[in-house]
Curated annotation (Swiss-Prot):
Cofactor: Fe(2+)
Gene Ontology terms describing biological process: small molecule biosynthetic process
UniProt-listed InterPro entries: DIOX_N, IPNS-like_FE2OG_OXY, IPNS-like_sf, Iron_ascorbate_oxido_reductase, Oxoglu/Fe-dep_dioxygenase_dom
Gene Ontology MF terms in the entry: dioxygenase activity; metal ion binding
Occurrences of domain Fe2OG dioxygenase (ranges): 175-289
Biotechnology: Pneumocandin B0 is the starting molecule for the first semisynthetic echinocandin antifungal drug, caspofungin acetate. Pneumocandin B0 is a minor fermentation product, and its industrial production was achieved by a combination of extensive mutation and medium optimization. Inactivation of three of gloP/GLP450-1, gloO/GLP450-2, and gloM/GLOXY1 generates 13 different pneumocandin analogs that lack one, two, three, or four hydroxyl groups on 4R,5R-dihydroxy-ornithine and 3S,4S-dihydroxy-homotyrosine of the parent hexapeptide.
Lineage: Eukaryota, Fungi, Dikarya, Ascomycota, Pezizomycotina
Annotated signal peptide: none
Residues annotated as binding Fe cation: 201, 203, 261
PROSITE patterns, per the entry: FE2OG_OXY (PS51471)
The entry's keywords: Dioxygenase, Iron, Metal-binding, Oxidoreductase
Pfam families: 2OG-FeII_Oxy, DIOX_N
Protein name per Swiss-Prot or TrEMBL: 2-oxoglutarate-dependent dioxygenase gloF
Length: 328
């Protein structure tokens, strides 16, 4: 069972029928799985190659250099370098299911988070230019590429759901999204609790745009058989994996699914306990709405006025509710 793959050129350059079909298939797959893969995006292959190069270079820096951009011990500002184990996503595993998390899964991952360059509420944290020349400028430029791609996908979803084209975009007037580089250090299989490098969780925002290497291990929960996970493998490092975040699930009253996902031992191989898993690298852009917009369900998706989400929280309040748990 494989997650569907779409060709972005059908949306970007195709005729009216190709455009319509892309939007329809995008929404149908996100309704069924919450995940989809998109090839031939607006992000050039050469940029992705350089992105992974910077990813490896940054995490290979000595710890005292990465400490210059250290994420605080507190949840905010959610910026900078987090050491292995500093964040614990397993604490929010059952958040959107209204379930209490019953198992702590240690995280074997370090990360680097950044937001928009002009975000005054949560300013970015950077290492010095001499520590990794060109890193900051490149990452800021890549962030803008993701912002533009995210914007186009929101238009496509509005079309696929027969909503006004700018309905979703109107809730993204200020740039509050985040970009994260991940590094999963090599580790012996016997040291992984439940075979996981990070525990299951869902994402906070509207859409996540993920690039990953070929190491494998990403799994998504089957929305028709909760508790069962299937692998999400990339055919190439240039393929963008797109998944629905909690805010988009809430707006659509669960029409589009924010599926739990995790990083597990790759399937299809019997690992010995002393076998060492290779380093794993990925980069995720978390598209997020304006901080002051409500994340209640849209009336268009509430048959008979029934809504699963009517707690009148805005996006920042919702984001903080989950973030405070992960960095508790």
């Amino acid at each position: 069972m494989a997650i569907q793959t779409l060709d972005y050129r059908d949306f970007q350059y195709g005729g009216q029928e190709q455009h319509r079909t892309f939007c329809h298939n995008l929404c149908e797959t996100l309704s069924t799985w919450g995940f989809i893969k998109i090839q031939n995006t607006s992000i050039p292959d050469a940029v992705i190659d350089e992105l992974f190069s910077y990813n490896k270079k940054f995490f290979a820096l000595p710890e005292h250099i990465k400490q210059k951009a250290r994420h605080p011990a507190a949840p905010n500002p959610h910026r900078g370098w987090s050491a292995v184990g500093q964040e614990q996503l397993s604490r929010i595993a059952g958040f959107e299911k209204d379930e209490e998390t019953d198992g702590f899964v240690p995280e074997y991952r370090e990360s680097f988070d950044q937001g928009a360059a002009d975000d005054e509420l949560f300013p970015n944290r950077w290492i010095d230019e001499d520590d990794l020349p060109g890193f900051r400028k490149f990452m800021e430029n890549y962030y803008e590429m993701c912002y533009n791609f995210h914007t186009q996908l929101l238009r496509a979803i509005s079309t696929g759901l027969s909503l006004p084209e700018d309905l979703l975009l109107s809730r993204h007037q200020t740039d509050t999204s985040e970009l994260r580089m991940n590094h999963y250090p090599a580790i012996a299989c016997e040291n992984l609790k439940f075979g996981m490098r990070i525990g299951e969780h869902s994402d906070f925002g509207t859409l996540t745009l993920l690039l990953q290497d070929s190491t494998g291990g990403l799994q998504v929960e089957d929305q028709k058989k909760l508790g069962t996970f299937i692998p999400v493998e990339s055919d190439s490092r240039y393929e963008v994996i797109v998944n629905v975040g909690d805010c988009l699930q809430r707006w659509t009253n669960r029409r589009l699914r924010s599926a739990n996902h995790r990083v597990h031992l790759p399937e299809g191989k019997n690992f010995k306990s002393d076998e060492v898993l290779a380093d794993r690298y990925s980069v995720a852009y978390f598209g997020k709405p304006d901080r002051n917009v409500l994340v209640d369900s849209f009336p268009e998706f509430c048959r008979g006025g029934e809504s699963k989400y009517n707690d009148h929280m805005n996006a920042l309040e919702y984001n903080q509710t989950k973030l405070l748990r992960t960095y508790a």
